[in-house]
Amino acid sequence: MKKFSSLLHNLILTPSRNTKIKLLQDYFKKLDINRAYALAILSDQLSFQFIKASKLRELVYEQVDQHLFDYSYDYVGDLAETISLIWPTKKEGKSQNLSTLIENIKKIKKTEINTKFSRILSELSNNERWTLIKICTGGLRIGVSERLVKTALADLYNKSVNEIEEIWHGLEFPYENLF
C-alpha cells in the first residue's frame, strides 16, 4: 500500500505528462498482483459496495467532533484529504500490500463496516488513508486518464496505443493477457 500511495502522491504532484507516464511504467514493471489492482483502480474498474462518502462521514463523526470535522472540511475542500488528516491514528500497523488490503476490505460485511473499516483507517498512515478513501469513493482525480494509462502500458511493452485499446475491453482482472 505504501508504494501505491506513493505513486498516487507523485502523480497528483507531477504536472508533466511524460513524468506521469514514467511513474506509471516504473510501477507496472513489477511482477506482482499489486499492479493488476493498481490498473483496476486507475482505470476505474474497482468499486466497493458499502463504502461511500456518507458512510465515511458517519465513521469520522464517531472519531472526532462533528463541528470540528465540518469546519475542517469547509476549509480543506476535499473529503479524503480532510478525513486522512483529522482521523486519529491509534497505532500505525504493519503496512499491508495493496492486494491484501483490498481483498480484506471486500470481505467486510455491511454490518461490520463501522468497526473493521475504522480499524483499518486507524492503522494506516495519512497518505495511505488518503489513498484508500480515494479508492473507496472512486474519485481519484489525480490527473491520470485511462488513455494515459494505456499510453504508459503501450510504451512499456513496445506496442501501439491502438493495440492496447483493441484488447482493452476484453481484459478481465488480473489482466494476465496484458501483463
Model-predicted regions and their roles:
Residues 1-179:
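N-terminal nucleic-acid-engaging modules of covalent nucleotidyltransferase systems
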